[in-house]
Every structure is written in structure tokens, then in C-alpha cells.
Amino acid sequence: MKKLIIAIATCMIFGMADAQDRRQMGGIYHAYPYASMADNLIDATPEGYTPFYLSHYGRHGSRWMTNDERYEWLYSYFVDRQNLTPLGRKVGKAMRKVLDNARGNGGRLSRLGAIQHEGIARRMYSRLPQIFAPGNRVKARASVVDRCVKSMQAFTAMMQSLQPALEMDIAADSANMAWIAYTAPEVKELEKSLNIVARTNPER
């Protein structure tokens, strides 16, 4: 009996691990959770040293798919109910809810994306509170893209809630795009020589 219980428990553990692995196989479509184990990788400040400056360059948080058309395209496969199995009809019904919920949000920052940037601010403050002492200055710059601006706002709002006496210098200006979305001269030369434009697939 004991062997049977151990065998069942082992199967359950591997089953849960397998489910987690399959979710993570979503690649760019999987919002990887923050792993608290990473906290153990942060070294303490060496004796005799005092942190005085922190620089962070980050990407926007989790977003909705790039545009509403992506959701409509997915749902289009479930419109013809006559060609669906019972499971297909059930999935189609769920997809309709997803489509209705997503409409108008294509490419925008999701609530999870905002939470991710709030978490970054919270961890910065808890690990290096002396850098964020009253009167110190936080300078934040973002791309003019809406999801990037919203990510910055989530970060800075959390930081200010943790330390209201901080001086906040916040901006999203097209004048900063040259360094925020920098393209190396080598890439530009390569584009010219190959007569192609190196870019990310817009269908991601």
C-alpha cells in the first residue's frame, strides 16, 4: 500500500511539473513569473561600500497581442459551428469571450504587465533603500509607444508610493527615441548592403 501511495504521489509531482513545462513552451506568449529564488543571487553590498546609483534599462511589461486582428483571426476558426466537435464548440465559446475582452486593447499593456513593473520598483526599493532616500531623484524615460509609457508609469507610481519624498523626473519624448530604440551603424550598413530591413516579425 505504501509503495502504491508513493507511486501515485510521484506521478502527481511529475504531472504538475509537466504542466508547468508545457505552459513555459509558449515562448514569447508565456508571461514568465518572477522567481523568488533570484533573490539569493543578489550579493550583499561589500563592507566599506555604499550604493549611491542604480541604472535600469527594461522592456515593457506583458501586453495584449499586437493588434485586435490577431484575436479575430483566431476566433474565425471557430465561427462555423457545424464543422466543430463538442470540444471545439466549447473552445469557440471561450474564444468569443477572449475576443470581446481583448477588443480595443491590441498592443496595449496588460494589468499583468503593470504588476511586473510595480514589482521591479518594489524590489529595487527593498534591496537598496538608501538610494531612494527622501529628496533623491529618480529620472525615468520611456519610448513614446503607449505600452512603454504605461510600464514606466506603473514603475514610477509604485516607487513614489514607497517613498513620497522622492523627486520624480518623468518623460516620454520622441527626442529620446534615438537612444531608447537605438540602431547600431553596423546594422544600418547591413540593411543597405542586403537591401532588406532587419526587423521583428509584426505577427508575434
PLM features: residue spans?
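Non-catalytic terminal regions with compositionally biased, polar/charged low complexity
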Residues: 20-204
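Sec-dependent N-terminal signal peptides
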Residues: 4-15
